[in-house]
Every structure is written in structure tokens, then in C-alpha cells.
Amino acid sequence: MTGSPVRANRPPGRVAAGPCRVRHVPRKACGRPVPARLLTSSGRTYAPGMDTSRLLRTTGTVIAAAGLLLSGCTSGGLGEPGAAAFSPPESGTAKAQPSPDAAALRPYYKQKLTWRDCGVPGFQCSTMKAPLDYAKPGSGQDVDIAVSRRTATGPGKRLGSLVVNPGGPGGSGIGYLQAYAGIGYPAAVRARYDMVSFDPRGVERSTPVECLKGPAMDKYTQVDQTPDDPAERAELVAAFKEFAAGCEANSGRVLPHVSTVDAARDMDLLRALLGDEKLNYVGASYGTFLGATYADLFPDRVGRLVLDGAMDPTRPALELNRDQTEGFDTAFTAFAKDCAKQPDCPLGKGGPDAVGARLKEFFRKVDAQPVSSGDPDRPLGEALATTGVIAALYDESAWPQLREALSSAMNGDGSGLLSLADSYYEREADGKYANLMFANAAVNCLDQPPAFSGPEAVDTALPSFEKASPVFGAGLAWAALNCTYWPVKATGKARELTAKGAAPIVVVGTTRDPATPYKWAQALAGQLESGTLLTYDGDGHTAYGRGSDCIDAAINRYLLEGKAPEDGKKC
């Protein structure tokens, strides 16, 4: 478990390893044959139906597992920047930033997307330019934003583009589109919409944030996240500092400009270049924060927005991490109850407290004496073991795999938990990492001030984290220390997003979601002036496309007919 900041993160050391395993696997997909792997346009492979980034990674979760303004008064029908100065909503982060020059932004809105073959059947790719700094759009410094689409399949009248974001922050929208959304969303939706996604600035195919190479990342993800003495505490702090220094050395130009507000501005640029007057969007996990930020900045350009697995933007970093810690405990309780009923449960019988105590004892043992994992440079210690467990808690379809991996680890074979952790970190077999963890930290640390001022502040907060989760609390608290040493000062802060004047926005919450607690969905739906809450009473992270006919029907009707479900509807 090694970290990243607060928002939608993953802990260093959590992974998903294939169809019907961790992350975002549609529940029904587990009952039908699927190809073993899909090759996306970056050359990275994904298991079909597996969203490797819909995990909400907050400062603590990423570490722990290891832890625009262009509203225009113009006649341009696509919301091109006009002569009037941008006036952001009062609740938006952008309020304190200089208003961008509309004339300087116009060339960006006038560019054309040139579509080319991606090398992935059915998909096209393109690249758009966006200003590095929206406060200085005429400076000549730009970033590349990679885009992909699959055109509407028909039959039926085309409704425009549907932009999807899998979460993160740091998740590759293009990888998600090509491996899942573009082929796995309901056929009726794909028939009427061009399915579109992009890698946000800082992510993979777009101008990326880079921090550490593979061997250094291997070391980083093994750092003990529950320091037992001053030496281990110093080692953890040093790891955070080394990670931050690597990001500054390799990506210093980009780091100040990868906030969620920047990404929302890029999304409005994309909307215009796609030829859409309104943005139609489905965002999961952290993608709900991106979508809500967009709506708050551009309420008049909101089309049909679905925010699934919602975040509460009013929660400061400390509370986000503590809430998520509580969410993982809720998910673990559900796993523990199920495990105790299974004949192959390696944690024995009894209630969640007894099962949790045995898991905690296992973590203590591998902390003192790591077990073999098949990789001599990465034995399974507490950090990687914890990440592997947390990764599997994102989806109940991964519980059988988790039981098997725990059983093997308790008998001296840590390869199963290591595989889960590697999947969470998006580590390939050749030792290379996707840049998800780098982008995750960069976005989270920019969006909010750090959760803690230093190790002493963690000490103060530990009791509340351990109360939230006796098993995972300490590690997730220490993981949230990551942003304390970030080289760039945060530009955002916790705030209410209201999107005053926007069309109806559907907010989806799952009652036992481990990564985005249900109360966050309730809060966001209440903040958004036009928000309507759709509830799934169940387990797992996010709800759409994961096996609930009730949820899918409500969202499909909204996307296809524009009819939002009744506020408070439960499935």
C-alpha cells in the first residue's frame, strides 16, 4: 500500500485480475463466455468487462492499498468562447482563477478532430489540443488530449455522443471505452449514441504525468503502511517524498494543470468538437466528481448526465479518506459474513469481528515474515497483501478469488494476492506500470489540500480511522499522508456543487459500496439543484451495467428518452 491523494484512489497494492474478478465487472458478464483479453489502442491489454479504474482512489486508499470557463454570449451553437468574460458559478473552484480570454480560446474550439483507425476493430482515435493553463490560453503551451469513439451502430435516430469516464482519477477512458463501454453498454444505447471517451490530461495517451520507473514503483508499493516504530515511520515518509520528487522531476510542467476543473474544461472543448450542443455523459466513481464539476461550470450545456457511485464534493480530504475507510469496512463485513458460510473460507467461522481479527493476524504475520509470491523481488508482505484484499472488496464477484488467494497465502503461496495487487496497480507482467497511480496522486493532491499536515496529525486521527475499520483503518490513515509532501500547492478545496439551471442529473448510489459510501450519493443528489437519486440496494462499487435490470432500465430510459427516474427510486 503506497499512496496517492484523496479523492478517487486506489491503494498501492490493490488489483483486479481479470473478468469476473475485481473492479468493474458487469455481474451478468460472469455468466457468459468472453474473450480472455482485449488489446486496446495503447497496446495495453484488458480483461473484457473489467474496468480497471472505476475504483475511487483517495489519498488513503491508494496509498493504503499499497493509497470552463467559456460560457459564451455568441451565436455559436456549440458553445464556442464568446466575447463576454467567463463567469464561473460561485461554488466552483474556478472562481478564484483568472477568467480566461475568450478570443485566445477560440482557436481551440475551432480545431477539427481528424479520426483515424485505432488498430482496434470498430473504434477510431483522434487527438485534440487544449491549453496547458486555461488562465493563459494564448501562451503557446498546450497539452494533447487523446480521444476515441465508436460510432452509433443503429438502428434508430442518432442522439449525439455519449462521453463515458471510468473513474480514478487517472483511469484511462480510452482503455475503458475500447475494452468495455464501447462493446458492453446496452445495445439500445450504443445504437443511438456515438460512444466516446478520452484520457484526461495527465493520463496515459494524453500528455501524461510520469513519476517512477518499474523497479522504483515495485519498491514503493511494498513500503509498510502501518509503521510500528520510528524507523518504519521515517521509511514511509521518505517513500512519499521520493514519489513526489519523481513526479516533479519528470512532469513538473504538467503538475500544476491536471486538476478536475482543468479536465472539465477539456470535456467542454471535446463536446464542442464532437458537434454536440449539450454534453451527454456517464461517469463512474471519481467520474461523478468530474461530471458534477462540469455541470457546475457549464449548467446550460448539460444534456443527460448519469453520475454512478457518487462522491460528495463537500467532504475535505480527511473526511473523504475516513468515509472510504468506513466503506471498505462495510464491504469487508459483507465479505466476512459470506466467507463464514463457505466450506473453503480460510478465515474460519464466526461473525465479522472474528473473521476480521483473523485477517488482521494474517497481516501481522506477513509483516513480520513475508511469504513467497513467485517473484523473488516482491515477496508478499503486509502492504501488498492488504492491497490485494482491498482490490477484491470492490466487487462481490471477486470474493471466491479472494478466498482462494488468502488460503494459498496462509499456506505459503502469496502469488494470488500479489496478482490482485498488481491488477489494482495496473502493473504488467514485464514490470511496467500504467501511469494511473501517478495521475491519481497528481489530480488528488491538486484538487484538495492534504488530509494531514504531518505524521503527528496522523497519530491524532488514528483512533477515528481504526474505529471506522479495525482491519484497514491504520493503513488507510497513513496512506492519506501522501499529499503532505506534494511539490505543487492544491488549487481546489471541498465545496458544494449545485449546477444551478442544469437539466435533470441522475445520481446513482449503491447501499454497500466500498469505495463511494452511499451517503455520498445522497449528499451529491441533494446539492445538485436538478439532482435525482437512484438507489441500488446491494454490494459492489457502482451499479449501472452490473446486473440490476431495475437500475439498467431506469438509466437506459433516461439516456434514450430523457425521462429521469423519480427522485428516491430504489432497486
Which residues does each PLM region occupy?
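Catalytic-loop region of hydrolases
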Residues: 3, 7, 44, 51-61, ...
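Conserved acidic catalytic loop of the alpha/beta-hydrolase fold
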Residues: 264-277
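Alpha/beta-hydrolase fold nucleophile elbow
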Residues: 276-285
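Histidine-bearing beta->alpha loop at or near hydrolase active sites
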Residues: 537-543
